[in-house]
Amino acid sequence: MSLMTKLGFRALVASCLIAAGGAAHAQVNVLITGVGSTQFPIATANFVNEASLPQQVTSVVRGDLARSGKFSNVDAGSTPVPETASVDFGAWKAKGANAFVAGSVNREPNGQYKVNFILYDTVKQQSLGGLSLTTSNDNEGMRKTGHKIADYIYQKLLGVRGVFNTRLSYVQRTGNVYKLLISDSDGQNAIPALTSKEPIISPAWSPSGTKVAYVSFELRKPVVYIHDLPTGRRYVISNQKGNNSAPAWSPDGQTLAVALSLTGNTQIYSVSSTGTGLRRLTRSSSIDTEPFYSPDGKWIYFTSDRGGAPQIYRMPAEGESAGAAQRVTFTGSYNTSPRVSPDGKLLAYISRTGGGFKLYVQDLQSGAANAVTNTTRDESPSFAANGQYILYARQSGGRSVLAAVPSDGSAPPQILSVQGGAIREPSWGPFMQ
């Protein structure tokens, strides 16, 4: 794979990046199962009154907890248990559950539904609190409520904010039709933000989670757009001469870094989120591309072949005029696609190793880097909002799929179950506001 193909102008090779796939519409079911050798045993009883609902809340909760790989679901039986019931801690502990969830769903006079639940620690024999959530009686509303409950459980028991109530974006190709899809974190409720007969690549979430920047070829060249999800409105932010690619948001959402071939070689520029104030940030005779802001907004990580082969560098967010770019990756001779974890401590990237491309994670303080996959065609890493997982694209069984892996490499990657179509270019959205 040449430098031009892998890195220089991703826009020119979109057809290669999202070429494979079948004809069926894809529904992604995120299956992060078996992650981690130690799992927290928890029993989630059926909620009272949920049996007649179009979507049972507890099935979403159990599915989320299982997919996280951090929990094992203990059979709670089929009898619903309300949050108001007295809890026999010893009985649940005897079943092997260190935590227990009880709840109910009740219809309000206005047609909405109130979902109440309480989480219990069966070891300490105490309540860990709960929530009272209002939702609509439809699949989307009940699933979102289930994700919120799972997030509460994850944070209370593990001390880390959950990412179940977040969203994914990815590109699906079905035949000659491309779709930019927005889905729940488990792949359900997928909605097309854009459908096109031309390639779509490089979706990137805004920090607010309300916008997605991406590259579309609908004007017969790569152009950067922003799509406002609540309104459905979209607009061009970069349609300069040559290629416009690799958009990346600043942490405040006011600026995007983009890669443009405006003067010949691809260089990195910044532009406001309204498409004004274009400013060049790199000035090299090499290819500089794939920018990504550090979470504190002080740095931009990017890929460049200025040293003879593609490596990841870091420069001040104001550009090289404010300080020389410094090389960051030294493991291997070919490293691309930088992504920094939300806490700024880790760098995920793709490294060419043994003729293949693997997902690596580097500790930015120590410089230690390790492969967290054993596959050979990994691409497009994206951290979860809590930094616990990395979503990425890979090849499996001759087709393109998505996969997730713990960012600490504590367990093997798990393929996300995809039915039909080619799924590429994943991006994990931020925490919901």
UniProtKB/Swiss-Prot annotation:
Write down the PANTHER family for this protein, in alphabetical order.
Answer: PROTEIN TOLB, PROTEIN TOLB HOMOLOG
Q: Sorted alphabetically, which keywords does the UniProt record give?
A: Cell cycle, Cell division, Periplasm, Signal
Main location as per UniProt:
periplasm
Q: How does it assemble?
A: The Tol-Pal system is composed of five core proteins: the inner membrane proteins TolA, TolQ and TolR, the periplasmic protein TolB and the outer membrane protein Pal. They form a network linking the inner and outer membranes and the peptidoglycan layer.
Report the locations given in the UniProt record. Periplasm
Q: Which GO terms describe its cellular component?
A: periplasmic space
Per the entry, what this protein does is: Part of the Tol-Pal system, which plays a role in outer membrane invagination during cell division and is important for maintaining outer membrane integrity.
Question: Which Gene3D superfamilies does this one have?
Answer: TolB, C-terminal domain, TolB, N-terminal domain
Database matches in InterPro entries: 6-blade_b-propeller_TolB-like, PD40, Tol-Pal_TolB, TolB_N
Q: Which family does it belong to?
A: Belongs to the TolB family.
Q: What is this protein called?
A: Tol-Pal system protein TolB
Instruction: Tell me which HAMAP family the record gives.
Output: TolB
Q: From which lineage does this chain's organism come?
A: Bacteria, Pseudomonadati, Pseudomonadota, Betaproteobacteria, Burkholderiales
Short name of any one Pfam family annotated for the protein: PD40
Q: Provide a GO biological process annotation.
A: protein import
Question: Which interval of the chain is the signal sequence?
Answer: 1-26
On whether Signal is a keyword of this UniProt record, the answer is yes
